């Protein structure tokens, strides 16, 4: 059985990514609005809908869409959710590979294709092995890894940001009230908000685990509410901390979060902290992979068992886990990593 806090943490790591913080930090105080608008029009409504549907129809996206539009459209919905994640896994694990390169004190290693491919393959199959062991191990690994690899680094950034302001260090972004409004650059501004909407995707992915709660009707809405609050905490305040202290030109597209922490640690004479926090960030990203591996594939199994997919893909192991889907999924990711 899962607990409310475990399911909430799995939802947080499925949605909130520390990787995106440096890019948003470039907008300074305006990042608050750029986070809140998508939260109001997408994150919160999605959370409310997921909580409502999960209390009435267990099984996640496939079951919800099937009940409204029939089996085939339900299958299409879960297929789209599943396939877009299959091609995302190598990207997320490549971020882990970059973080691990800072653990070894070799940041440039993240540009080595052989190293990145090897890390993708090893960690993806490790995630798959965790998922194949069933709900208890999956929930523990995902929630604990998310706690120390996502929440803790986010809170540390907040503390660093507060200290930076308190001791009067130079602030790298404007603190004027006018800076709260993002610059209007036409269609590009709308695209930015839409991209942040996509950054909030995933609130519904763990609805397939609602039945693993002792009292799904009461506990799933609580888990979603807690996850929503934590997601906003993880994204908004740490972004501001980075904006206050780190010039944007010093942040890379992939390793930006690692460079941001290095800036803080070096400034405070704690250079030893960079490899430690990079390891924790890698662990948090690993938790997100674990969460996404177990979610859509379980929903796809529900569709497969209606006869919409071959019997081989309906196979489950002794832990009642969708082995017939996870193994082919791993093969696809391995091929993508080798390209």
Regions found by a protein language model. Name each.
Residues 29-30, 56-59, 67-73, 211-219, ...:
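Juxtamembrane helix-boundary/capping and inter-helix hinge elements in multi-pass membrane proteins
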Residues 62-65, 70, 102-107, 223-290, ...:
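TM-loop-TM module centered on a large, flexible mid-protein loop between adjacent transmembrane helices
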Residues 10, 35, 39, 85, ...:
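Hydrophobic alpha-helical transmembrane segments in multi-pass membrane proteins
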Residues 111-115, 144-278:
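Helix-loop-helix junctions that connect adjacent transmembrane segments
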Residues 17-25, 30, 130-136, 309, ...:
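Transmembrane helix-loop junctions in multi-pass membrane proteins
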Residues 5-11, 104-136, 150-158, 326-332:
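Transmembrane alpha-helical segments of multi-pass small-molecule transport proteins
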Residues 1-51, 55, 174-179, 183:
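Membrane-interface "cap" regions at the ends of multi-pass membrane proteins
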Residues 25-26, 44-124, 128-132, 282-302:
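Hydrophobic transmembrane alpha-helices that form the core helical bundles
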């Amino acid at each position: 059985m899962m607990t409310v806090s475990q399911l909430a943490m799995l939802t947080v790591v499925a949605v909130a990514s520390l990787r995106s913080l440096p890019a948003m930090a470039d907008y300074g105080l305006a990042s608050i609005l750029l986070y809140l608008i998508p939260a109001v029009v997408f994150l919160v409504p999605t959370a409310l809908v997921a909580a409502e549907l999960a209390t009435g129809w267990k099984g996640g996206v496939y079951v919800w869409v099937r009940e409204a539009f029939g089996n085939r459209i339900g299958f299409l919905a879960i297929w789209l959710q599943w396939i877009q994640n299959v091609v995302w896994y190598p990207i997320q694990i490549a971020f882990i590979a970059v973080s691990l390169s800072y653990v070894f004190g070799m940041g440039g290693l993240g540009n080595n294709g052989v190293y990145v491919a090897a890390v993708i393959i090893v960690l993806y199959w490790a995630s798959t092995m965790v998922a194949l062991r069933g709900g208890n191990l999956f929930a523990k690994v995902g929630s604990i890894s998310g706690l120390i690899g996502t929440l803790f680094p986010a809170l540390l950034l907040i503390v660093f940001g507060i200290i930076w302001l308190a001791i009067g260090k130079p602030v790298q972004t404007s603190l004027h009230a006018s800076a709260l409004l993002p610059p209007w650059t036409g269609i590009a501004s709308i695209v930015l908000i839409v991209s942040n909407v996509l950054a909030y995707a995933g609130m519904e992915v763990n609805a397939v685990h609602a039945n693993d709660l002792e009292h799904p009707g009461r506990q799933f809405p609580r888990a979603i509410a807690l996850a929503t609050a934590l997601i906003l905490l993880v994204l908004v305040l740490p972004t501001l901390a980075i904006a206050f202290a780190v010039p944007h030109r010093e942040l890379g597209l992939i390793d930006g979060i690692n460079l941001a922490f290095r800036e803080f640690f070096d400034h405070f004479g704690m250079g030893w902290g960079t490899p430690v926090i990079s390891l924790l960030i890698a662990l948090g990203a690993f938790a997100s992979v674990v969460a996404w591996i177990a979610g859509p594939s379980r929903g796809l199994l529900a569709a497969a068992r209606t006869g919409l997919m071959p019997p081989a893909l309906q196979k489950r192991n002794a832990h009642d886990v969708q082995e017939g889907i996870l193994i082919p999924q791993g093969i696809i990711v391995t091929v993508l990593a080798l390209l």
